[in-house]
């Protein structure tokens, strides 16, 4: 996946860092918040899943002229912290390019991913975490269907084989 993201600082303070949510990586292993939630619901299917049944993301590169470093947070592997070289002023913006791949999980865990004949995609793109009053609200995937996002527009170009069909509940804006 090649993704271009543009962020505008609408908070009232300069931002030294930004946060991204990478919910595809919440299926990585038994240490993620999602794995713990599935286990708390007394389902052992995820705990005993084979690696090929689990999803993940692999980031090849995150680049911008204002990125110092980036890292996944230790305690939440589906949140990415991007440290900036210089703060983004109020009203300022940044454009980020991300090169990454995702591995879809077996849909039996949450209803999203793949099964024998279908792909069920939801919350699979990397997105900006929500920010309000200069406070970041980083949200890990807990399979609650409640990802709160910054207002954003998306332009997707998807290629697939002719024998497949694409269905979406996205609203098309012109």
Regions found by a protein language model. Give the residues of each.
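Beta-strand-rich interaction surfaces with strong enrichment in secreted/lumenal proteins
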Residues: 5, 69-71, 83-88, 141-146, ...
């Amino acid at each position: 996946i090649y993704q271009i993201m543009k962020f505008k600082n609408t908070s009232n303070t300069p931002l030294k860092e930004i946060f991204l949510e990478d919910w595809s990586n919440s299926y990585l292993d038994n240490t993620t918040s999602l794995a713990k939630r599935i286990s708390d619901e007394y389902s052992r299917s995820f705990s005993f899943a084979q690696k090929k049944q689990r999803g993940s993301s692999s980031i090849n590169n995150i680049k911008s002229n204002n990125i110092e470093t980036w890292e996944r947070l230790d305690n939440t592997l589906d949140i990415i912290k991007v440290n900036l070289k210089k703060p983004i002023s109020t009203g300022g913006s940044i454009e980020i390019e991300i090169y990454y791949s995702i591995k879809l999980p077996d849909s039996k865990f949450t209803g999203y991913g793949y099964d024998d004949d279908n792909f069920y995609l939801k919350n699979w793109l990397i997105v900006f975490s929500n920010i309000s009053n200069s406070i970041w609200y980083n949200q890990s995937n807990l399979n609650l269907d409640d990802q709160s996002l910054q207002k954003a527009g998306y332009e997707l170009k998807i290629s697939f084989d002719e024998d497949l069909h694409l269905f979406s509940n996205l609203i098309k804006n012109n």
